[in-house]
Amino acid sequence: MATFKDTCYYYKRINKLNHAVLKLGVNDTWRPSPPTRYKGWCLDCCQHTDLTYCRGCTMYHVCQWCSQYGRCFLDSEPHLLRMRTFKNEVTKNDLMNLIDMYDTLFPINQRIVDKFMNSTRQHKCRNECITQWYNHLLMPITLQSLSIELDGDVYYVFGYYDSMSDINQTPFSFTNLIDMYDKLLLDNINFNRMSFLPVTLQQEYALRYFSKSRFISEKRKCVSDLHFSVNVIENLHNPSFKIQITRNCSDFSSDWNGVCKLVKDVSAYFNVLKTSHIEFYSISTRCRVFTQHKLKIASKHIKPNYVTSNHKTSATEVHNCKWCSINNSYTVWNDFRVKKIYDNIFNFLRALVKSNANVGHCSSQEKIYEYIKDVLDVCDDEKWKIAVTEIFNCLEPVELNNVKYALFNHEVNWDVINLLVQSVDKVPQILTLNDIVIIMKSIIYEWFDIRYMRNTPMTTFTVDKLRRLCTGVKTVDYDSGISDVE
Protein backbone atom coordinates (compact mmCIF):
# COMPACT_ATOMS: atom_id res chain seq x y z
CA MET A 1 0.00 0.00 0.00
CA ALA A 2 1.24 3.51 -0.79
CA THR A 3 2.36 5.22 2.41
CA PHE A 4 1.23 8.70 1.34
CA LYS A 5 -2.20 7.40 0.34
CA ASP A 6 -2.65 5.58 3.66
CA THR A 7 -1.49 8.60 5.63
CA CYS A 8 -4.00 10.88 3.88
CA TYR A 9 -6.78 8.36 4.50
CA TYR A 10 -6.23 8.19 8.27
CA TYR A 11 -5.23 11.81 8.90
CA LYS A 12 -8.28 13.04 6.99
CA ARG A 13 -10.37 12.17 10.06
CA ILE A 14 -8.57 14.24 12.68
CA ASN A 15 -9.99 17.71 11.90
CA LYS A 16 -12.02 19.80 9.45
CA LEU A 17 -8.98 21.19 7.61
CA ASN A 18 -7.55 17.75 6.96
CA HIS A 19 -10.93 16.47 5.79
CA ALA A 20 -10.94 19.14 3.07
CA VAL A 21 -7.26 18.99 2.09
CA LEU A 22 -6.48 15.26 2.24
CA LYS A 23 -9.35 14.03 0.10
CA LEU A 24 -7.89 11.68 -2.51
CA GLY A 25 -9.77 9.96 -5.30
CA VAL A 26 -7.85 6.77 -4.59
CA ASN A 27 -9.50 6.59 -1.15
CA ASP A 28 -13.01 7.12 -2.53
CA THR A 29 -15.38 4.99 -4.57
CA TRP A 30 -13.95 4.07 -7.97
CA ARG A 31 -15.58 5.70 -10.97
CA PRO A 32 -15.14 4.99 -14.70
CA SER A 33 -11.98 6.60 -16.04
CA PRO A 34 -9.83 6.68 -19.19
CA PRO A 35 -7.72 3.54 -19.80
CA THR A 36 -4.22 3.40 -18.37
CA ARG A 37 -1.18 3.46 -20.63
CA TYR A 38 2.05 3.88 -18.66
CA LYS A 39 3.53 2.92 -15.31
CA GLY A 40 4.76 5.49 -12.83
CA TRP A 41 3.83 7.44 -9.72
CA CYS A 42 0.47 9.18 -9.48
CA LEU A 43 1.27 12.74 -8.47
CA ASP A 44 -1.99 13.01 -6.54
CA CYS A 45 -1.74 9.96 -4.25
CA CYS A 46 1.97 9.12 -4.76
CA GLN A 47 1.38 5.41 -5.36
CA HIS A 48 3.20 3.50 -8.10
CA THR A 49 0.57 2.15 -10.46
CA ASP A 50 -0.81 2.26 -14.01
CA LEU A 51 -1.38 5.87 -15.06
CA THR A 52 -3.90 7.59 -17.28
CA TYR A 53 -3.74 11.07 -18.77
CA CYS A 54 -4.53 14.24 -16.85
CA ARG A 55 -7.43 16.36 -18.09
CA GLY A 56 -5.50 19.51 -17.19
CA CYS A 57 -2.27 18.99 -19.15
CA THR A 58 -2.88 15.72 -21.14
CA MET A 59 0.29 14.13 -19.68
CA TYR A 60 0.24 10.75 -17.98
CA HIS A 61 0.62 11.46 -14.27
CA VAL A 62 -2.63 10.42 -12.55
CA CYS A 63 -4.05 7.01 -11.59
CA GLN A 64 -7.52 5.82 -12.56
CA TRP A 65 -8.91 6.54 -9.10
CA CYS A 66 -7.53 10.06 -8.71
CA SER A 67 -8.55 11.03 -12.25
CA GLN A 68 -12.14 11.56 -11.03
CA TYR A 69 -11.08 14.84 -9.36
CA GLY A 70 -9.19 16.04 -12.43
CA ARG A 71 -6.41 17.65 -10.40
CA CYS A 72 -3.29 18.87 -12.14
CA PHE A 73 -0.05 20.17 -10.66
CA LEU A 74 -0.52 23.25 -12.89
CA ASP A 75 -3.90 24.22 -11.37
CA SER A 76 -4.41 27.45 -9.44
CA GLU A 77 -6.84 25.99 -6.88
CA PRO A 78 -4.89 25.29 -3.64
CA HIS A 79 -5.60 21.56 -3.41
CA LEU A 80 -2.97 19.28 -1.87
CA LEU A 81 -1.24 18.47 -5.18
CA ARG A 82 -0.92 22.16 -6.06
CA MET A 83 0.37 23.06 -2.59
CA ARG A 84 3.05 20.37 -2.93
CA THR A 85 4.18 21.73 -6.32
CA PHE A 86 7.03 24.24 -6.35
CA LYS A 87 8.49 26.04 -9.34
CA ASN A 88 11.94 27.12 -10.56
CA GLU A 89 14.11 28.68 -7.83
CA VAL A 90 13.20 26.97 -4.57
CA THR A 91 14.61 28.76 -1.51
CA LYS A 92 15.30 27.45 1.98
CA ASN A 93 12.37 29.52 3.21
CA ASP A 94 10.09 27.80 0.67
CA LEU A 95 11.20 24.41 1.97
CA MET A 96 10.56 25.52 5.56
CA ASN A 97 7.00 26.42 4.56
CA LEU A 98 6.59 22.99 2.94
CA ILE A 99 7.82 21.23 6.09
CA ASP A 100 5.45 23.35 8.20
CA MET A 101 2.57 22.28 5.95
CA TYR A 102 3.52 18.61 6.37
CA ASP A 103 3.74 19.05 10.13
CA THR A 104 0.34 20.77 10.21
CA LEU A 105 -1.44 18.15 8.12
CA PHE A 106 0.42 15.08 9.39
CA PRO A 107 1.35 15.77 13.02
CA ILE A 108 2.95 13.08 15.15
CA ASN A 109 2.61 13.59 18.91
CA GLN A 110 1.59 11.46 21.84
CA ARG A 111 -2.11 12.24 21.48
CA ILE A 112 -2.15 11.34 17.76
CA VAL A 113 -0.14 8.15 18.26
CA ASP A 114 -2.39 7.00 21.11
CA LYS A 115 -5.50 7.80 19.07
CA PHE A 116 -4.36 5.72 16.08
CA MET A 117 -3.04 2.84 18.18
CA ASN A 118 -6.25 2.63 20.20
CA SER A 119 -8.36 2.58 17.05
CA THR A 120 -6.14 -0.11 15.52
CA ARG A 121 -6.15 -2.48 18.51
CA GLN A 122 -9.60 -3.81 17.79
CA HIS A 123 -8.68 -7.46 18.33
CA LYS A 124 -6.25 -9.41 20.43
CA CYS A 125 -4.06 -10.22 17.43
CA ARG A 126 -3.44 -6.50 16.86
CA ASN A 127 -1.69 -5.84 20.13
CA GLU A 128 1.71 -6.08 18.50
CA CYS A 129 3.02 -3.24 16.32
CA ILE A 130 3.07 -4.54 12.77
CA THR A 131 4.15 -2.13 10.03
CA GLN A 132 1.18 -2.68 7.73
CA TRP A 133 -1.25 -1.67 10.51
CA TYR A 134 0.60 1.58 11.26
CA ASN A 135 1.72 2.57 7.78
CA HIS A 136 0.12 6.00 8.26
CA LEU A 137 2.45 6.77 11.18
CA LEU A 138 5.54 5.83 9.19
CA MET A 139 5.59 8.63 6.62
CA PRO A 140 8.66 10.78 7.36
CA ILE A 141 9.00 14.40 6.28
CA THR A 142 11.45 14.45 3.37
CA LEU A 143 12.33 16.75 0.48
CA GLN A 144 11.85 13.99 -2.08
CA SER A 145 10.21 15.24 -5.28
CA LEU A 146 9.39 14.34 -8.86
CA SER A 147 10.61 17.09 -11.17
CA ILE A 148 9.95 18.03 -14.78
CA GLU A 149 11.17 20.80 -17.07
CA LEU A 150 8.60 22.42 -19.35
CA ASP A 151 10.08 25.04 -21.69
CA GLY A 152 12.49 26.51 -19.20
CA ASP A 153 10.23 26.18 -16.14
CA VAL A 154 11.17 23.45 -13.67
CA TYR A 155 8.42 22.04 -11.44
CA TYR A 156 9.03 20.01 -8.27
CA VAL A 157 6.13 17.88 -7.01
CA PHE A 158 6.98 16.96 -3.42
CA GLY A 159 5.53 13.91 -1.72
CA TYR A 160 6.43 10.53 -0.32
CA TYR A 161 7.00 8.12 -3.22
CA ASP A 162 7.54 4.45 -2.35
CA SER A 163 9.69 2.01 -4.35
CA MET A 164 11.84 4.53 -6.20
CA SER A 165 13.51 1.77 -8.23
CA ASP A 166 10.24 0.71 -9.91
CA ILE A 167 9.65 1.30 -13.61
CA ASN A 168 9.01 4.94 -14.51
CA GLN A 169 7.56 5.64 -17.98
CA THR A 170 6.66 9.26 -17.22
CA PRO A 171 8.71 12.42 -17.98
CA PHE A 172 9.16 13.03 -14.23
CA SER A 173 12.45 12.21 -12.49
CA PHE A 174 13.34 11.97 -8.80
CA THR A 175 15.06 15.03 -7.35
CA ASN A 176 16.37 15.46 -3.80
CA LEU A 177 16.38 19.04 -2.50
CA ILE A 178 17.77 18.30 0.96
CA ASP A 179 21.05 20.07 0.10
CA MET A 180 19.08 23.29 -0.36
CA TYR A 181 17.79 23.00 3.19
CA ASP A 182 19.75 21.59 6.15
CA LYS A 183 20.29 17.87 6.64
CA LEU A 184 20.82 18.09 10.39
CA LEU A 185 17.77 20.28 10.88
CA LEU A 186 15.57 17.91 8.87
CA ASP A 187 17.06 14.96 10.80
CA ASN A 188 16.13 16.65 14.06
CA ILE A 189 12.54 17.28 12.91
CA ASN A 190 12.10 13.61 12.01
CA PHE A 191 13.82 12.31 15.14
CA ASN A 192 11.41 14.37 17.24
CA ARG A 193 8.45 12.87 15.37
CA MET A 194 9.90 9.39 15.62
CA SER A 195 10.37 9.64 19.39
CA PHE A 196 6.60 9.36 19.95
CA LEU A 197 6.41 5.99 18.18
CA PRO A 198 6.83 2.59 19.80
CA VAL A 199 10.38 1.23 19.56
CA THR A 200 9.37 -1.45 17.07
CA LEU A 201 8.11 1.25 14.65
CA GLN A 202 11.00 3.67 15.14
CA GLN A 203 13.42 1.47 13.21
CA GLU A 204 11.10 1.29 10.19
CA TYR A 205 10.50 5.06 10.34
CA ALA A 206 14.25 5.76 10.42
CA LEU A 207 14.92 3.36 7.55
CA ARG A 208 12.26 5.04 5.40
CA TYR A 209 13.49 8.50 6.29
CA PHE A 210 17.13 7.92 5.39
CA SER A 211 16.32 6.02 2.19
CA LYS A 212 14.14 8.91 0.95
CA SER A 213 16.32 11.78 2.17
CA ARG A 214 19.82 10.67 1.14
CA PHE A 215 19.31 9.49 -2.45
CA ILE A 216 21.11 11.01 -5.45
CA SER A 217 18.95 13.05 -7.84
CA GLU A 218 18.25 11.52 -11.24
CA LYS A 219 19.10 13.14 -14.55
CA ARG A 220 16.18 15.22 -15.78
CA LYS A 221 14.21 13.64 -18.63
CA CYS A 222 13.21 15.16 -21.96
CA VAL A 223 9.50 15.47 -22.66
CA SER A 224 8.41 13.69 -25.85
CA ASP A 225 5.20 12.99 -27.74
CA LEU A 226 4.94 9.62 -25.95
CA HIS A 227 4.18 11.41 -22.68
CA PHE A 228 0.94 12.97 -23.93
CA SER A 229 -2.54 11.52 -24.32
CA VAL A 230 -2.93 9.06 -27.18
CA ASN A 231 -6.21 10.83 -28.03
CA VAL A 232 -4.20 13.95 -28.86
CA ILE A 233 -1.57 12.09 -30.87
CA GLU A 234 -4.20 10.32 -32.96
CA ASN A 235 -5.75 13.66 -33.99
CA LEU A 236 -2.58 15.57 -34.89
CA HIS A 237 -3.18 14.95 -38.60
CA ASN A 238 -6.14 17.35 -38.40
CA PRO A 239 -4.81 20.95 -38.73
CA SER A 240 -7.93 22.39 -37.08
CA PHE A 241 -7.86 20.00 -34.10
CA LYS A 242 -7.78 21.70 -30.70
CA ILE A 243 -6.95 20.10 -27.36
CA GLN A 244 -9.70 20.51 -24.78
CA ILE A 245 -8.45 20.84 -21.20
CA THR A 246 -9.97 21.74 -17.83
CA ARG A 247 -8.26 23.46 -14.92
CA ASN A 248 -9.26 23.76 -11.26
CA CYS A 249 -9.06 27.45 -10.41
CA SER A 250 -9.72 29.88 -7.58
CA ASP A 251 -9.54 33.63 -6.98
CA PHE A 252 -6.53 33.22 -4.69
CA SER A 253 -3.40 35.06 -5.82
CA SER A 254 0.03 34.38 -4.36
CA ASP A 255 3.58 33.69 -5.43
CA TRP A 256 3.74 30.15 -6.81
CA ASN A 257 5.79 28.62 -4.00
CA GLY A 258 3.84 30.36 -1.24
CA VAL A 259 0.52 28.53 -1.65
CA CYS A 260 1.43 25.90 0.96
CA LYS A 261 1.32 28.60 3.67
CA LEU A 262 -2.49 28.70 3.34
CA VAL A 263 -2.96 25.75 5.70
CA LYS A 264 -1.64 27.87 8.57
CA ASP A 265 -4.79 30.01 8.36
CA VAL A 266 -7.80 27.69 8.30
CA SER A 267 -10.48 30.36 7.80
CA ALA A 268 -8.54 31.93 4.91
CA TYR A 269 -8.15 28.51 3.29
CA PHE A 270 -11.87 27.78 3.40
CA ASN A 271 -12.65 31.26 2.04
CA VAL A 272 -10.40 30.48 -0.93
CA LEU A 273 -12.12 27.13 -1.48
CA LYS A 274 -15.46 28.97 -1.79
CA THR A 275 -14.14 30.63 -4.96
CA SER A 276 -13.10 27.31 -6.55
CA HIS A 277 -14.34 26.72 -10.07
CA ILE A 278 -13.41 24.91 -13.28
CA GLU A 279 -12.18 26.71 -16.40
CA PHE A 280 -12.15 25.23 -19.91
CA TYR A 281 -9.59 25.95 -22.62
CA SER A 282 -9.18 25.00 -26.28
CA ILE A 283 -5.48 24.69 -27.02
CA SER A 284 -3.58 24.60 -30.30
CA THR A 285 -1.35 21.57 -30.94
CA ARG A 286 1.42 23.82 -32.31
CA CYS A 287 4.73 22.87 -30.64
CA ARG A 288 8.02 21.17 -31.49
CA VAL A 289 7.12 17.87 -29.83
CA PHE A 290 3.97 17.35 -31.92
CA THR A 291 5.53 18.80 -35.08
CA GLN A 292 8.42 16.36 -34.85
CA HIS A 293 5.95 13.52 -34.33
CA LYS A 294 4.20 14.38 -37.61
CA LEU A 295 7.44 14.82 -39.54
CA LYS A 296 8.79 11.51 -38.22
CA ILE A 297 5.64 9.68 -39.31
CA ALA A 298 5.88 11.26 -42.77
CA SER A 299 9.57 10.29 -42.95
CA LYS A 300 8.64 6.62 -42.56
CA HIS A 301 6.65 6.80 -45.82
CA ILE A 302 9.22 8.65 -47.93
CA LYS A 303 9.81 7.31 -51.46
CA PRO A 304 13.31 8.64 -52.28
CA ASN A 305 13.26 7.31 -55.87
CA TYR A 306 11.12 10.30 -56.87
CA VAL A 307 14.23 12.53 -57.01
CA THR A 308 15.49 10.62 -60.07
CA SER A 309 12.08 10.27 -61.74
CA ASN A 310 10.48 12.06 -64.69
CA HIS A 311 6.94 12.18 -63.30
CA LYS A 312 4.96 15.27 -64.28
CA THR A 313 2.92 15.24 -61.07
CA SER A 314 3.98 16.23 -57.56
CA ALA A 315 5.48 13.62 -55.24
CA THR A 316 2.26 12.91 -53.33
CA GLU A 317 0.17 12.63 -56.50
CA VAL A 318 2.16 9.90 -58.26
CA HIS A 319 0.05 6.79 -58.89
CA ASN A 320 0.80 3.31 -60.21
CA CYS A 321 4.55 3.66 -59.83
CA LYS A 322 6.26 0.87 -57.92
CA TRP A 323 9.10 3.12 -56.75
CA CYS A 324 7.50 6.55 -56.23
CA SER A 325 3.85 6.11 -55.20
CA ILE A 326 3.16 6.83 -51.54
CA ASN A 327 0.23 5.32 -49.67
CA ASN A 328 -2.20 8.24 -49.29
CA SER A 329 -4.41 6.24 -46.93
CA TYR A 330 -2.11 7.01 -43.97
CA THR A 331 -3.63 9.70 -41.75
CA VAL A 332 -0.44 11.78 -41.76
CA TRP A 333 -1.25 12.85 -45.34
CA ASN A 334 -4.60 14.27 -44.18
CA ASP A 335 -2.61 17.28 -43.00
CA PHE A 336 -2.22 19.35 -46.16
CA ARG A 337 0.78 21.15 -44.63
CA VAL A 338 2.77 17.91 -44.46
CA LYS A 339 1.84 17.16 -48.09
CA LYS A 340 2.95 20.64 -49.16
CA ILE A 341 6.31 20.25 -47.46
CA TYR A 342 6.80 16.78 -48.94
CA ASP A 343 5.93 17.95 -52.46
CA ASN A 344 8.16 21.04 -52.37
CA ILE A 345 11.14 19.32 -50.73
CA PHE A 346 11.11 16.56 -53.34
CA ASN A 347 10.52 18.97 -56.20
CA PHE A 348 13.61 20.91 -55.11
CA LEU A 349 15.73 17.78 -54.54
CA ARG A 350 14.74 16.35 -57.93
CA ALA A 351 15.85 19.57 -59.60
CA LEU A 352 19.21 19.28 -57.81
CA VAL A 353 19.70 15.64 -58.79
CA LYS A 354 18.63 16.20 -62.40
CA SER A 355 20.99 19.19 -62.66
CA ASN A 356 24.04 17.29 -61.43
CA ALA A 357 23.58 13.56 -62.10
CA ASN A 358 22.93 11.55 -65.23
CA VAL A 359 20.03 9.47 -63.93
CA GLY A 360 17.04 8.95 -66.15
CA HIS A 361 14.58 6.69 -64.33
CA CYS A 362 13.19 6.20 -60.83
CA SER A 363 13.90 2.46 -60.90
CA SER A 364 17.65 3.05 -60.65
CA GLN A 365 19.37 2.38 -57.33
CA GLU A 366 21.35 5.39 -56.12
CA LYS A 367 23.43 6.03 -52.99
CA ILE A 368 21.64 9.33 -52.41
CA TYR A 369 18.43 7.49 -51.47
CA GLU A 370 19.66 6.44 -48.03
CA TYR A 371 20.19 10.07 -46.98
CA ILE A 372 16.90 11.43 -48.35
CA LYS A 373 14.92 9.53 -45.70
CA ASP A 374 16.00 12.06 -43.05
CA VAL A 375 15.28 15.33 -44.89
CA LEU A 376 11.88 16.05 -43.29
CA ASP A 377 12.72 15.87 -39.57
CA VAL A 378 14.32 19.30 -39.21
CA CYS A 379 13.65 19.19 -35.44
CA ASP A 380 16.65 16.87 -35.07
CA ASP A 381 19.02 19.55 -36.36
CA GLU A 382 22.28 17.60 -36.17
CA LYS A 383 20.95 14.51 -37.92
CA TRP A 384 19.16 16.65 -40.51
CA LYS A 385 22.30 18.65 -41.40
CA ILE A 386 24.33 15.45 -41.78
CA ALA A 387 21.71 14.10 -44.19
CA VAL A 388 21.70 17.31 -46.27
CA THR A 389 25.51 17.38 -46.35
CA GLU A 390 25.65 13.78 -47.61
CA ILE A 391 23.03 14.59 -50.27
CA PHE A 392 25.16 17.54 -51.39
CA ASN A 393 28.26 15.34 -51.60
CA CYS A 394 26.37 12.80 -53.72
CA LEU A 395 25.83 15.57 -56.30
CA GLU A 396 29.61 15.62 -56.90
CA PRO A 397 29.93 19.39 -56.44
CA VAL A 398 32.72 21.38 -58.09
CA GLU A 399 35.21 23.09 -55.76
CA LEU A 400 36.29 26.64 -56.52
CA ASN A 401 38.37 28.76 -54.11
CA ASN A 402 37.70 26.25 -51.31
CA VAL A 403 33.93 26.52 -51.81
CA LYS A 404 31.92 23.69 -53.35
CA TYR A 405 29.14 24.44 -55.84
CA ALA A 406 26.35 22.35 -57.36
CA LEU A 407 24.43 23.21 -60.53
CA PHE A 408 20.78 24.16 -60.36
CA ASN A 409 19.32 24.42 -63.86
CA HIS A 410 16.30 22.10 -63.80
CA GLU A 411 12.71 23.30 -63.65
CA VAL A 412 10.88 23.60 -60.31
CA ASN A 413 7.28 24.43 -59.41
CA TRP A 414 6.03 27.92 -58.62
CA ASP A 415 5.91 27.30 -54.86
CA VAL A 416 9.61 26.45 -54.84
CA ILE A 417 10.42 29.44 -57.09
CA ASN A 418 8.71 31.79 -54.63
CA LEU A 419 10.60 30.25 -51.71
CA LEU A 420 13.89 30.56 -53.60
CA VAL A 421 13.29 34.26 -54.10
CA GLN A 422 12.36 34.70 -50.42
CA SER A 423 15.35 32.79 -49.08
CA VAL A 424 18.21 33.68 -51.48
CA ASP A 425 16.65 36.71 -53.27
CA LYS A 426 16.74 35.08 -56.73
CA VAL A 427 16.40 31.87 -58.70
CA PRO A 428 20.07 30.80 -58.74
CA GLN A 429 21.98 28.75 -61.30
CA ILE A 430 24.50 27.39 -58.80
CA LEU A 431 24.13 26.59 -55.11
CA THR A 432 26.46 26.08 -52.17
CA LEU A 433 25.75 23.70 -49.30
CA ASN A 434 24.70 26.65 -47.15
CA ASP A 435 22.25 27.81 -49.84
CA ILE A 436 20.67 24.35 -49.96
CA VAL A 437 20.34 24.25 -46.17
CA ILE A 438 18.65 27.67 -46.15
CA ILE A 439 16.26 26.76 -48.98
CA MET A 440 15.24 23.40 -47.53
CA LYS A 441 14.65 24.92 -44.11
CA SER A 442 12.57 27.67 -45.72
CA ILE A 443 10.36 25.05 -47.36
CA ILE A 444 9.67 23.42 -43.99
CA TYR A 445 9.50 26.66 -41.98
CA GLU A 446 6.80 27.99 -44.32
CA TRP A 447 4.36 25.72 -42.50
CA PHE A 448 6.17 24.59 -39.35
CA ASP A 449 8.58 27.28 -38.17
CA ILE A 450 10.14 25.45 -35.24
CA ARG A 451 12.41 28.42 -34.48
CA TYR A 452 9.48 30.18 -32.81
CA MET A 453 7.73 27.16 -31.32
CA ARG A 454 7.54 26.08 -27.70
CA ASN A 455 8.94 22.61 -27.14
CA THR A 456 5.80 21.40 -25.35
CA PRO A 457 2.17 22.34 -26.10
CA MET A 458 0.37 25.14 -24.30
CA THR A 459 -1.46 22.53 -22.23
CA THR A 460 1.62 22.78 -19.97
CA PHE A 461 1.01 26.49 -19.32
CA THR A 462 0.00 27.67 -15.86
CA VAL A 463 -3.53 29.05 -15.42
CA ASP A 464 -2.22 32.63 -15.32
CA LYS A 465 -0.56 32.23 -18.73
CA LEU A 466 -3.63 30.56 -20.21
CA ARG A 467 -5.82 33.42 -19.01
CA ARG A 468 -3.52 36.05 -20.51
CA LEU A 469 -3.44 34.25 -23.84
CA CYS A 470 -7.17 33.63 -23.77
CA THR A 471 -7.92 37.35 -23.44
CA GLY A 472 -5.96 37.89 -26.65
CA VAL A 473 -7.51 34.83 -28.33
CA LYS A 474 -4.07 33.31 -28.79
CA THR A 475 -4.63 29.88 -27.29
CA VAL A 476 -5.93 28.79 -30.69
CA ASP A 477 -3.15 30.15 -32.86
CA TYR A 478 -2.90 29.86 -36.64
CA ASP A 479 -6.01 28.91 -38.56
CA SER A 480 -5.72 25.81 -40.71
CA GLY A 481 -5.26 27.82 -43.90
CA ILE A 482 -2.49 30.09 -42.68
CA SER A 483 1.18 29.14 -42.71
CA ASP A 484 3.80 30.21 -40.18
CA VAL A 485 5.32 32.60 -42.72
CA GLU A 486 1.99 34.32 -43.35
Swiss-Prot record:
Region (Zinc-binding domain): 42-79
Region (Important for cytoskeleton localization) residue spans: 82-176
GO cellular component, one term: host cytoskeleton
Entry-linked InterPro entries: Rotavirus_NSP1 (IPR002148)
Taxonomic superkingdom: Viruses
Residues spanned by motif pLxIS motif: 480-483
Organism the protein comes from: Rotavirus A (strain RVA/Human/United States/D/1974/G1P1A[8])
Self-association and partners: Interacts (via C-terminus) with host IRF3; this interaction leads to IRF3 degradation. Interacts with host IRF7; this interaction leads to IRF7 degradation. Interacts with host CUL1 and CUL3. Interacts with host BTRC.
Name of the protein in its database record: Non-structural protein 1
Gene Ontology molecular-function annotations: metal ion binding; RNA binding
Motif (IKBKB-like degron (ILD) motif): 479-483
GO biological process terms, semicolon-separated: symbiont-mediated suppression of host cytoplasmic pattern recognition receptor signaling pathway via inhibition of IRF3 activity; symbiont-mediated suppression of host cytoplasmic pattern recognition receptor signaling pathway via inhibition of IRF7 activity; symbiont-mediated suppression of host NF-kappaB cascade
Job description of the protein: Plays a role in the inhibition of host innate immunity by inducing the degradation of key host factors required to activate interferon production such as IRF3, IRF5 or IRF7. Associates with components of cullin RING ligases (CRLs) including CUL1 or CUL3, which are essential multisubunit ubiquitination complexes, to modulate their activities. Recognizes the host NF-kappa-B regulator BTRC through the presence of a DSGXS motif in the C-terminal substrate recognition domain.
Recorded family membership: Belongs to the rotavirus NSP1 family.
Free-text comment on this protein's domains from its UniProt entry: The integrity of the zinc-binding domain in NSP1 is important for degradation of host IRF3.
Region (RNA-binding): 1-81
Chain residue ranges for the region called Interaction with host IRF3: 317-486
Short name of any one Pfam family annotated for the protein: Rota_NS53
Post-translational modification: The C-terminal region is phosphorylated by host CKII/CSNK2A1. Phosphorylation of the DSGXS motif is essential for host NF-kappa-B inhibition.
Subcellular location: Host cytoplasm, Host cytoskeleton
Key words of the record: Host cytoplasm, Host cytoskeleton, Host-virus interaction, Inhibition of host innate immune response by virus, Inhibition of host IRF3 by virus, Inhibition of host IRF7 by virus, Inhibition of host NF-kappa-B by virus, Inhibition of host RLR pathway by virus, Interferon antiviral system evasion, Metal-binding, Phosphoprotein, RNA-binding, Viral immunoevasion
